[in-house]
Amino acid sequence: WRQYVPSACTYENAVPHALLWGEKALLARLRGMEQADWVQAAHGSEGLWSKVWKAVQAQPDYERVLEASKSKRYPRTRLQRLLLCAYLGIDTQTLLREAPYVRVLAFDEMGRTVLRQAKKDARLTLINAGQTPPDEVYYALERRCAALYGLFAMQPELFSEQVARIYQKPLGPA
């Protein structure tokens, strides 16, 4: 994959993120959810929603929520997926939905060649920075998730600049 991704766009060069930096935002959102909201979250089930909801209300941090909810039946990874989907407002139907477009974030000369071919052969629409995709519902979800993910950035202002480059239309000639 490295041959298709410019080095400036690799994970190593991304704005640093960590759970710790956004933990309060995560817990605030999860604590504000009603039990009925948990039923909508992907990766849950009848007993799990109730168990996690109680842990979120009682535990002081994310790690303790996981510890209080974890069991043989509900492993840590499933709990993490449930909490992330609940935080982002993603239900099972949305999770199973096929992506309606591909957002191109960056490319070099080799990528330009690949994109030219992809435009001819692709089943999905290719969207560049500043373009609004045809599916408004999915686009709104994408923007909401990006905004919430930004709360986990060590330097939120740098992440905000990256998001602005992706979603804002470039200024044309005056």
Residues of each region from the PLM?
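Active-site cores that bind ATP or allylic diphosphates and position pyrophosphate for catalysis
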Residues: W1-A174
